[in-house]
Amino acid sequence: MNVHAVNRRTFLKTAGTAAAVSLLPSRLLWAAGEHKVNKVGVQLYTVRDLMKNDFEGTIAKVAQIGYKEVEFAGYFGRTADQVKAVLEKNGLRAPSTHVQYDELDDKFPSVIEFSKAIDLEYIICPWIPEDLRKNPDIWKQAADKFNKAGEQTKKAGMQFGYHNHWFEFLPTNGKLPYDELLKLCDANLVKMEMDLCWIETTGTDPVKYFDQYPGRFPLVHVKDVKTMPKISSGGAQNFGDTVDLTEVGSGVIDWKRIFAHSEKAGIKHYIVEHDHPKQPIESIKGSYEYLSKLRW
Protein backbone atom coordinates (compact mmCIF):
# COMPACT_ATOMS: atom_id res chain seq x y z
CA MET A 1 0.00 0.00 0.00
CA ASN A 2 1.02 3.60 -0.57
CA VAL A 3 1.16 6.24 2.20
CA HIS A 4 -1.96 4.57 3.68
CA ALA A 5 -4.96 3.72 1.51
CA VAL A 6 -7.10 5.08 4.35
CA ASN A 7 -6.14 8.14 6.39
CA ARG A 8 -6.26 6.71 9.90
CA ARG A 9 -7.01 9.87 11.81
CA THR A 10 -9.75 11.00 9.42
CA PHE A 11 -11.31 7.56 9.45
CA LEU A 12 -11.38 7.29 13.22
CA LYS A 13 -13.01 10.73 13.49
CA THR A 14 -15.73 9.96 10.98
CA ALA A 15 -16.42 6.26 11.45
CA GLY A 16 -19.79 5.77 13.04
CA THR A 17 -19.21 2.50 14.82
CA ALA A 18 -16.50 0.48 16.47
CA ALA A 19 -17.25 -2.23 13.95
CA ALA A 20 -15.99 -0.02 11.14
CA VAL A 21 -12.71 0.50 12.94
CA SER A 22 -12.28 -3.23 13.34
CA LEU A 23 -12.20 -3.61 9.56
CA LEU A 24 -8.79 -1.93 9.38
CA PRO A 25 -5.66 -4.11 9.58
CA SER A 26 -4.28 -3.96 13.10
CA ARG A 27 -0.89 -2.65 11.99
CA LEU A 28 -2.54 0.51 10.65
CA LEU A 29 -3.89 1.57 14.02
CA TRP A 30 -1.99 3.51 16.68
CA ALA A 31 -3.87 1.67 19.41
CA ALA A 32 -3.14 2.78 22.94
CA GLY A 33 -0.36 0.83 24.61
CA GLU A 34 2.18 1.29 27.33
CA HIS A 35 5.24 1.06 25.07
CA LYS A 36 6.61 3.54 22.53
CA VAL A 37 9.85 4.63 20.87
CA ASN A 38 11.14 7.26 23.27
CA LYS A 39 13.90 8.57 21.02
CA VAL A 40 13.56 8.09 17.28
CA GLY A 41 16.90 8.07 15.47
CA VAL A 42 17.88 8.29 11.82
CA GLN A 43 20.77 6.90 9.78
CA LEU A 44 22.23 9.92 8.00
CA TYR A 45 23.00 7.79 4.95
CA THR A 46 19.35 8.51 4.10
CA VAL A 47 20.19 12.20 3.59
CA ARG A 48 23.74 11.69 2.30
CA ASP A 49 23.31 13.73 -0.88
CA LEU A 50 22.09 16.71 1.14
CA MET A 51 24.91 16.25 3.66
CA LYS A 52 27.51 16.55 0.90
CA ASN A 53 26.35 20.06 0.06
CA ASP A 54 25.23 21.28 3.48
CA PHE A 55 26.41 19.16 6.39
CA GLU A 56 25.38 21.53 9.17
CA GLY A 57 22.13 22.64 7.55
CA THR A 58 20.98 19.09 6.89
CA ILE A 59 21.60 18.02 10.48
CA ALA A 60 19.62 21.07 11.62
CA LYS A 61 16.68 19.98 9.43
CA VAL A 62 16.84 16.49 10.92
CA ALA A 63 16.61 17.96 14.42
CA GLN A 64 13.74 20.26 13.43
CA ILE A 65 11.67 17.23 12.41
CA GLY A 66 11.98 15.96 15.97
CA TYR A 67 14.74 13.38 15.79
CA LYS A 68 16.84 13.08 18.94
CA GLU A 69 19.51 10.68 17.69
CA VAL A 70 21.53 10.30 14.51
CA GLU A 71 23.77 7.56 13.21
CA PHE A 72 26.67 8.66 11.05
CA ALA A 73 27.87 7.14 7.77
CA GLY A 74 30.75 9.52 7.11
CA TYR A 75 31.68 13.00 8.29
CA PHE A 76 32.30 14.80 4.98
CA GLY A 77 35.66 16.21 6.01
CA ARG A 78 34.58 17.61 9.38
CA THR A 79 36.77 17.29 12.44
CA ALA A 80 35.58 15.62 15.61
CA ASP A 81 35.21 19.03 17.27
CA GLN A 82 33.09 20.30 14.37
CA VAL A 83 30.86 17.22 14.45
CA LYS A 84 30.41 17.45 18.20
CA ALA A 85 29.59 21.16 17.95
CA VAL A 86 26.84 20.70 15.35
CA LEU A 87 25.29 17.91 17.43
CA GLU A 88 25.27 20.04 20.56
CA LYS A 89 23.90 23.05 18.68
CA ASN A 90 20.90 21.01 17.51
CA GLY A 91 20.24 19.07 20.70
CA LEU A 92 21.22 15.77 19.12
CA ARG A 93 23.34 12.86 20.20
CA ALA A 94 24.95 10.22 18.03
CA PRO A 95 24.98 6.79 19.61
CA SER A 96 26.64 5.11 16.63
CA THR A 97 28.49 5.30 13.34
CA HIS A 98 29.09 3.00 10.37
CA VAL A 99 32.64 2.16 9.29
CA GLN A 100 33.63 0.02 6.33
CA TYR A 101 35.07 -3.49 6.59
CA ASP A 102 38.46 -2.38 5.28
CA GLU A 103 38.72 0.19 8.07
CA LEU A 104 38.86 -2.47 10.77
CA ASP A 105 42.60 -3.13 10.45
CA ASP A 106 45.32 -0.46 10.31
CA LYS A 107 42.83 2.43 10.19
CA PHE A 108 40.82 1.24 13.16
CA PRO A 109 42.76 3.02 15.93
CA SER A 110 42.00 6.37 14.29
CA VAL A 111 38.34 5.33 13.88
CA ILE A 112 38.18 4.60 17.60
CA GLU A 113 39.85 7.89 18.47
CA PHE A 114 37.39 9.92 16.36
CA SER A 115 34.40 7.95 17.66
CA LYS A 116 35.41 8.47 21.26
CA ALA A 117 35.93 12.19 20.66
CA ILE A 118 32.28 12.61 19.59
CA ASP A 119 30.99 10.42 22.44
CA LEU A 120 29.76 7.46 20.42
CA GLU A 121 28.61 4.25 22.11
CA TYR A 122 28.77 1.93 19.11
CA ILE A 123 30.99 1.42 16.08
CA ILE A 124 29.13 -0.62 13.46
CA CYS A 125 30.40 -2.43 10.38
CA PRO A 126 27.50 -2.19 7.91
CA TRP A 127 28.55 -4.45 5.07
CA ILE A 128 30.94 -7.11 3.83
CA PRO A 129 31.91 -6.35 0.20
CA GLU A 130 30.56 -8.64 -2.50
CA ASP A 131 33.97 -9.74 -3.77
CA LEU A 132 34.94 -10.93 -0.29
CA ARG A 133 31.67 -12.83 0.11
CA LYS A 134 32.69 -15.12 -2.75
CA ASN A 135 35.23 -16.67 -0.39
CA PRO A 136 33.54 -19.64 1.38
CA ASP A 137 35.55 -18.91 4.55
CA ILE A 138 34.66 -15.22 4.72
CA TRP A 139 32.19 -15.52 7.59
CA LYS A 140 34.70 -17.19 9.89
CA GLN A 141 37.30 -14.62 8.85
CA ALA A 142 34.81 -11.82 9.44
CA ALA A 143 33.93 -13.16 12.89
CA ASP A 144 37.62 -13.23 13.82
CA LYS A 145 38.05 -9.66 12.59
CA PHE A 146 34.93 -8.51 14.43
CA ASN A 147 36.09 -10.10 17.69
CA LYS A 148 39.43 -8.31 17.43
CA ALA A 149 37.72 -5.02 16.62
CA GLY A 150 35.37 -5.67 19.51
CA GLU A 151 38.29 -6.05 21.92
CA GLN A 152 39.80 -2.76 20.79
CA THR A 153 36.46 -0.98 20.94
CA LYS A 154 35.68 -2.32 24.41
CA LYS A 155 39.05 -1.14 25.74
CA ALA A 156 38.10 2.36 24.56
CA GLY A 157 34.79 2.17 26.45
CA MET A 158 32.57 1.54 23.43
CA GLN A 159 30.87 -1.42 21.75
CA PHE A 160 31.43 -2.95 18.31
CA GLY A 161 28.60 -4.29 16.18
CA TYR A 162 27.55 -5.59 12.77
CA HIS A 163 24.64 -4.49 10.55
CA ASN A 164 23.04 -7.04 8.25
CA HIS A 165 21.62 -6.90 4.77
CA TRP A 166 19.75 -9.72 2.99
CA PHE A 167 22.64 -11.97 1.98
CA GLU A 168 23.37 -13.11 5.54
CA PHE A 169 20.08 -15.03 5.47
CA LEU A 170 20.79 -17.02 2.32
CA PRO A 171 22.49 -20.42 2.76
CA THR A 172 26.22 -20.61 2.09
CA ASN A 173 27.68 -24.13 2.16
CA GLY A 174 24.53 -25.30 3.90
CA LYS A 175 24.71 -22.68 6.66
CA LEU A 176 23.23 -19.24 7.21
CA PRO A 177 25.99 -16.62 7.49
CA TYR A 178 24.03 -14.70 10.13
CA ASP A 179 23.81 -17.80 12.30
CA GLU A 180 27.54 -18.35 11.89
CA LEU A 181 28.32 -14.79 12.96
CA LEU A 182 26.15 -15.10 16.06
CA LYS A 183 27.85 -18.36 17.00
CA LEU A 184 31.43 -17.30 16.24
CA CYS A 185 31.35 -13.74 17.54
CA ASP A 186 31.86 -13.15 21.25
CA ALA A 187 28.51 -11.90 22.57
CA ASN A 188 30.26 -9.44 24.86
CA LEU A 189 32.46 -8.02 22.12
CA VAL A 190 30.16 -7.97 19.09
CA LYS A 191 26.52 -6.87 19.16
CA MET A 192 24.11 -6.87 16.24
CA GLU A 193 22.39 -3.92 14.64
CA MET A 194 19.54 -5.81 13.00
CA ASP A 195 18.11 -4.26 9.85
CA LEU A 196 14.51 -5.31 10.34
CA CYS A 197 13.51 -4.62 6.76
CA TRP A 198 16.24 -6.66 5.12
CA ILE A 199 15.65 -9.69 7.32
CA GLU A 200 11.90 -9.51 6.68
CA THR A 201 12.40 -9.39 2.90
CA THR A 202 14.12 -12.78 3.04
CA GLY A 203 11.12 -14.35 4.75
CA THR A 204 13.00 -14.69 8.03
CA ASP A 205 11.34 -13.78 11.31
CA PRO A 206 13.49 -11.42 13.42
CA VAL A 207 11.61 -12.49 16.55
CA LYS A 208 13.13 -15.95 16.19
CA TYR A 209 16.56 -14.40 16.68
CA PHE A 210 15.40 -12.25 19.57
CA ASP A 211 14.20 -15.41 21.32
CA GLN A 212 17.35 -17.37 20.55
CA TYR A 213 19.86 -14.60 21.28
CA PRO A 214 18.27 -12.27 23.85
CA GLY A 215 20.05 -9.00 24.48
CA ARG A 216 22.27 -9.21 21.38
CA PHE A 217 20.42 -6.48 19.43
CA PRO A 218 20.83 -3.03 21.07
CA LEU A 219 20.24 -1.20 17.78
CA VAL A 220 17.81 -1.81 14.94
CA HIS A 221 17.31 -0.22 11.53
CA VAL A 222 13.68 0.60 10.84
CA LYS A 223 12.59 0.92 7.22
CA ASP A 224 9.62 -0.40 5.30
CA VAL A 225 8.82 -2.08 2.00
CA LYS A 226 5.72 -1.68 -0.18
CA THR A 227 5.43 -5.38 -1.00
CA MET A 228 7.37 -8.42 0.12
CA PRO A 229 9.69 -9.49 -2.72
CA LYS A 230 10.72 -13.00 -3.61
CA ILE A 231 14.38 -13.82 -3.25
CA SER A 232 16.51 -16.68 -4.51
CA SER A 233 20.16 -17.40 -3.93
CA GLY A 234 20.81 -17.01 -7.66
CA GLY A 235 19.71 -13.38 -7.65
CA ALA A 236 21.05 -12.50 -4.24
CA GLN A 237 23.71 -9.99 -5.24
CA ASN A 238 21.33 -7.62 -7.03
CA PHE A 239 18.38 -8.25 -4.74
CA GLY A 240 18.75 -4.99 -2.82
CA ASP A 241 18.22 -2.92 -5.94
CA THR A 242 14.89 -4.64 -6.65
CA VAL A 243 13.27 -4.00 -3.27
CA ASP A 244 10.65 -1.24 -3.32
CA LEU A 245 11.43 0.61 -0.08
CA THR A 246 9.05 3.11 1.46
CA GLU A 247 8.56 5.22 4.56
CA VAL A 248 8.03 3.44 7.87
CA GLY A 249 4.34 2.75 8.41
CA SER A 250 3.38 3.04 4.75
CA GLY A 251 4.52 -0.48 3.91
CA VAL A 252 3.65 -4.02 4.91
CA ILE A 253 5.93 -4.73 7.88
CA ASP A 254 4.07 -5.35 11.15
CA TRP A 255 6.02 -3.09 13.49
CA LYS A 256 3.85 -3.69 16.53
CA ARG A 257 4.47 -7.41 16.37
CA ILE A 258 8.24 -6.94 16.14
CA PHE A 259 8.54 -4.18 18.71
CA ALA A 260 6.50 -6.19 21.21
CA HIS A 261 9.71 -8.22 21.62
CA SER A 262 12.02 -5.20 22.01
CA GLU A 263 12.81 -5.87 25.65
CA LYS A 264 13.94 -9.43 25.03
CA ALA A 265 15.98 -8.31 22.02
CA GLY A 266 17.67 -5.63 24.10
CA ILE A 267 16.75 -2.81 21.70
CA LYS A 268 17.82 0.63 22.90
CA HIS A 269 18.05 2.57 19.63
CA TYR A 270 15.46 2.63 16.82
CA ILE A 271 17.10 4.07 13.71
CA VAL A 272 15.08 5.07 10.63
CA GLU A 273 16.66 4.46 7.23
CA HIS A 274 15.68 4.61 3.56
CA ASP A 275 18.39 3.67 1.08
CA HIS A 276 17.08 5.58 -1.95
CA PRO A 277 14.42 8.15 -1.00
CA LYS A 278 13.21 10.48 -3.75
CA GLN A 279 12.66 13.28 -1.24
CA PRO A 280 14.98 12.55 1.72
CA ILE A 281 13.66 15.15 4.17
CA GLU A 282 10.01 14.34 3.45
CA SER A 283 10.84 10.66 3.73
CA ILE A 284 12.41 10.85 7.18
CA LYS A 285 9.64 13.20 8.30
CA GLY A 286 6.97 10.67 7.38
CA SER A 287 8.80 7.86 9.14
CA TYR A 288 9.31 10.01 12.23
CA GLU A 289 5.64 10.94 12.43
CA TYR A 290 4.59 7.31 12.28
CA LEU A 291 7.09 6.03 14.84
CA SER A 292 6.56 8.87 17.29
CA LYS A 293 2.85 8.00 17.48
CA LEU A 294 3.18 4.23 17.42
CA ARG A 295 2.14 2.37 20.59
CA TRP A 296 2.27 -1.31 21.33
Each language-model region and where it sits:
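Acidic-and-aromatic substrate-binding clefts and catalytic sites of carbohydrate-active enzymes
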Residues: 48-52, 71-81, 100-107, 130-134, ...
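C-terminal segment of N-terminal export signals and the immediately downstream linker at the start
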Residues: 26-53, 61
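Acidic/histidine-rich catalytic cores of soluble enzymes
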Residues: 155-252
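Short, acidic/polar
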Residues: 50-61, 105-114, 203-209, 255
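Active-site acidic/histidine proton-transfer and metal-coordination neighborhood
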Residues: 16, 21-23, 68-69, 93, ...
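Conserved, mostly hydrophobic/aromatic
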Residues: 42, 62, 70, 87, ...
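N-terminal secretory signal peptides and thylakoid transit peptides that target proteins
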Residues: 1-19
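Acidic (Asp/Glu)-rich catalytic clusters
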Residues: 35, 60-64, 78-94, 109-120, ...
